[in-house]
């Protein structure tokens, strides 16, 4: 099994920003790693605590990643941590 990680940031916590960023991130990961969607078992997202307007996993589902399990979680608040960040791990 191959596991691929990635991350992106958004300019502001708005549903459209999250949808756009997640869609672009997953498209780039697919392209750069020559992934096929039917090979993906699961996608796990984490986001910083300043993102609360939309689930990244729901954005992935709406972007066409509906045949694998999807999960979103919130990262712990870390002093000096990157703001408005969405991270992903693809199995």
What is each PLM-predicted segment?
Residues 1-91:
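Terminal domain-initiation and capping elements
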């Amino acid at each position: 099994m191959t596991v691929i990680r990635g991350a992106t940031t958004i300019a502001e916590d708005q549903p459209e920003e999250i949808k756009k960023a997640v869609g672009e991130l997953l498209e780039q990961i697919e392209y750069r790693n020559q992934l096929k969607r039917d090979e993906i078992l699961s996608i796990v997202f984490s986001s910083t605590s300043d993102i609360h307007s939309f689930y990244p996993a729901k954005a992935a589902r709406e972007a066409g990643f509906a045949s694998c399990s999807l999960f979103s979680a919130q990262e712990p608040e870390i002093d000096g941590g990157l703001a408005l960040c969405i991270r992903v791990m693809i199995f």
